[in-house]
Regions:
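Periplasmic polypeptide-binding modules associated with outer-membrane biogenesis and secretion
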Residues: 1-111, 140-153
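Residue-level signature of outer-membrane beta-barrel architecture
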Residues: 95, 126-128, 161, 203-205
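Membrane-proximal, glycine/serine-rich, low-complexity loop/turn segments characteristic
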Residues: 110-114, 127-129
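Hydrophobic, lipid-facing positions within transmembrane beta-strands of outer-membrane proteins
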Residues: 89, 118-122, 153-157, 195-199
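Transmembrane beta-barrel strands of outer-membrane/channel proteins
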Residues: 79-81, 105-109, 122, 136-142, ...
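Transmembrane beta-strand segments of outer-membrane beta-barrel domains in Gram-negative
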Residues: 102, 162, 167-231
Length: 231
């Protein structure tokens, strides 16, 4: 996107004009702003542009989108001509801190007769609270119809950490659920408990404004048990 075609000083003979193509490239990366996260990680992401040679729009787009995928990061880029390298351009990346946390909650009556129908859920995420560009998430859900003897309680915890300069993330999570179905199943005094452990690695293969293709590898471990009075 920085390539230029210029007409150098010359004598035109027989109607033939010589053109000179100057392939534009990134000569320097500058980071501005005081993000809450790991500035060294942000620079490693941005330095990928120095490895590309002639700058391609899709390479710049990929770097900026993966930067903005980092929890707590809002980044934009500005291009300017290099003062000492012909054909070179400096890329200034202006980084700001996004919200420290995000919270959402919901209350609906779309549960089942056995666990519901009223269901309350809430999620909270801390963005780079440890200044590592990490995401820490907590989620809860409950079916409060039975009040003290609730029909369902759920809790989840997860930690996601970017690794390397290419948008790869590693995530570990834990969730636990307690269930005591009501309605016609209440006579069987069913009580269940389940614990789930998750390890997940994810990498963006294609990252553009219009396309997002990721590959992931996930390991799950489930431990569950149930008690009842069914003979």
């Amino acid at each position: 996107i920085l390539t230029q075609v210029i007409i150098p000083p010359q004598t035109i003979e027989k109607g033939v004009v010589g053109l000179q193509v100057v392939e534009g490239f990134v000569s320097d990366i500058k980071i501005q702003g005081a993000p809450r996260g790991d500035i060294a990680m942000i620079r490693r992401y941005a330095n990928r542009l120095l490895e590309k040679g002639p700058l391609d729009a899709k390479d710049l787009e990929h770097v900026m989108l993966t930067l903005n995928d980092l929890p707590g990061v809002v980044a934009r880029s500005v291009l300017s001509a290099s003062v000492d390298q012909p054909g070179g351009s400096d890329v200034t990346i202006i980084v700001e801190s996004d919200e420290l946390y995000n919270v959402s909650w919901a209350l609906n009556n779309r549960g089942t007769r056995y666990m519901g129908p009223m269901v309350f859920s809430a999620d909270a995420q801390l963005n780079s609270a440890l200044k590592l560009n990490e995401a820490i998430r907590v989620g809860i859900a409950t079916a409060p119809d039975g009040h003290v003897d609730r029909e369902m309680d759920f809790l989840s915890l997860s930690y996601k950490q970017p690794v390397g300069p290419y948008g790869t993330t590693l995530e570990g999570g834990f969730s636990t659920a307690l269930s005591s179905p009501g309605y016609t199943l209440s006579q069987f005094d069913i009580n269940g408990r389940a614990e789930n452990y998750v390890l997940r690695a994810e990498h963006p293969v294609i990252r553009t404004r219009n396309k997002d293709l990721r590959v992931s590898l996930q390991f799950d471990a489930l431990n569950s048990h149930r008690t009842d009075n069914i003979n």
